[in-house]
Regions:
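Lumenal/extracellular ectodomains and adaptor appendage modules
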Residues: 18, 22-154
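Bacterial N-terminal signal peptides
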Residues: 8-18
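Bacterial N-terminal signal peptides that target proteins for export
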Residues: 1-8
Length: 154
């Protein structure tokens, strides 16, 4: 049975690798001046995760980004090797797989580097200034549960 889980960014630490930007509150009156020295800021981030019975997470991430200067886009790093410690003290290393990546109209290239799946969103030929919305959809496969009589999600 599938469950729809809407998770806050802070609760999904393995999926919330930094995208090299500062988080900011867009409704602050001095928002632009406060972060004007940064190349860009993430003004909002939302994630929706659908968990299948086979431990595959169908993830949709939406980022509102404000570019203070001309940039080609952003990077998104997804961890492929996850070390975890369970409540009983046992440890495990889980290797995840990323598939079915869709970034809509935004150009995207990817590579695997240092146990991370690296997404480069944006165009080498064009730059962006001002607000831009990125939506990234992908499957994050954690493999089958290895703990008997329990489901494991981290």
């Amino acid at each position: 049975m599938k469950k729809i889980i809407t998770l806050l960014l802070a609760l999904v630490l393995p999926l919330c690798a930094p995208i090299y930007a500062l988080a900011a509150t867009p409704d602050e009156s001095d928002f632009l001046s406060r972060y004007a020295q940064e190349p860009y800021v993430v003004t909002d981030c939302q994630m929706q995760v659908v968990v299948s019975e086979y431990n595959v997470l169908a993830v949709t991430e939406t980022y509102q980004v404000y570019f203070n200067e001309a940039r080609h886009g952003i990077y998104r790093y997804l961890p492929l090797r996850n070390q975890l410690t369970r409540t009983d003290g046992s440890t495990a290393v889980v290797t995840a797989r990323v598939s079915h990546v869709d970034t809509g109209a935004d150009e995207c290239s990817h590579e695997v580097s240092n146990d991370k799946y690296v997404l480069r969103l944006g165009s080498e030929d064009e730059t962006i200034t001002g607000p831009h919305t990125y939506t990234i959809r992908y499957n994050y496969d954690l493999g089958l549960d290895t703990v008997k009589n329990a489901d494991e999600l981290y």
